[in-house]
Amino acid sequence: MRLLEKLCSSAAGSSAPKPAFAKVLTPNRIPEFCIPPRLPAPCTLESPIRAAAVPRRCAAESDLWPRAADEDAGRTDWDPRSQAALSLPHLPRVRTTYGFCALLESPHTRRKESLLLGGPPAPRPRAHSCGGGGGPDAPLGTLCGPRGPGPATPAAPGGPRLPQDALAAGPRRCRLLRVPDGLLSRALRAGRSRRLARVRSVSSGNEDEERRAGSESPARAPSSSPLSSRAPLPERLEAKGTVALGRAGDALRLAAEYCPGTRRLRLRLLRAESLFGGAPGPRAVRCRLSLVLRPPGTARWQCSAVVGRSRKASFDQDFCFDGLSEDEVRRLAVRVKARDEGRGRDRGRLLGQGELSLGALLLL
């Protein structure tokens, strides 16, 4: 390349030495800013009105464009470089609050707002001149930035919508997904409560629902069968009993409750009597109870939480069995097993078991 430059310079006969780095930009060699115009298609012809209103001159030219004497009265943005940029039809523009036009975004870079507000890529509408007459191009109101689908709002009487309005409406359309507060803590609590969900007491809402269903069932019975002579079912059947666990003095107090309206059987473990008589200390007192409804055809098994660190074991835990008719409850019996959940070799040792008939307990 240097050899070619030397040959060209020697052929031209120029004796002035050229700088070694001619293509390096320095403050003394900064070129004029020039926006190249977009070349029109060879088959399209511009109208004479538009050709007169859109001068295709470069901003790097030294001379100014000729203008009429009364042109300054109606325009306040007469600048050769801005006019050169605004004369290009493929650059979007917007009307400012002061009444003159400005570029919507730089032709070489994109603003952050346009990146945030940008939706799916769509062909950019062509803009018409600020002072030009009506043409086939889109109006300035459509050049305020890409808008999402939504109800159209009327424009201000002084002109189209401002770009600030379009920017202010952007975060509403591009709302980011936020993680709810306390999500991790709720997940941790849910993991702990999942293990105890089977043995927790039924909430007051369920009790109210049972009471409501039980109160509605007697009222519906006479209306459905007014000629039946059978007495309406009571709201709920409640009873308390004791289950002997097979060892001397070991027993378990429980309460049974059956609601015919909801067909739900609830067994509440109240307390254990003399279950840990031979335990050396409160630290070794750990017990778990399991309940099984028999006969095996309708066997349902549930397990209680571990009760420990107390010689007076107070359970106060509920076991709910849904979908049981009155005839099934009359034939069912509950079998209770108590196992040691302590440490060492005694872990899992059977402390006792017993069985109680629900029909005899609830007097069905």
From Swiss-Prot:
It is found in: Nucleus. It comes from the Eukaryota. Keywords: Nucleus. SUPFAM superfamilies: C2 domain (Calcium/lipid-binding domain, CaLB). Residues 113-166, 194-234 are annotated as: Disordered. Residues 248-364 form the C2 domain. The keyword Hydrolase does not apply. Residues 215-232 have a biased composition (Low complexity). GO terms for cellular component: nucleus. Specifically expressed in endothelial cells. InterPro entries: C2_Ca-dependent_4, C2_dom, C2_domain_sf. One of its GO terms (biological process) is positive regulation of acute inflammatory response. The keyword Nucleus applies. Induction: Up-regulated by pro-inflammatory cytokines. May be involved in inflammatory process. May regulate cell architecture and adhesion. Belongs to the C2CD4 family. This is C2 calcium-dependent domain-containing protein 4B. It comes from Homo sapiens.
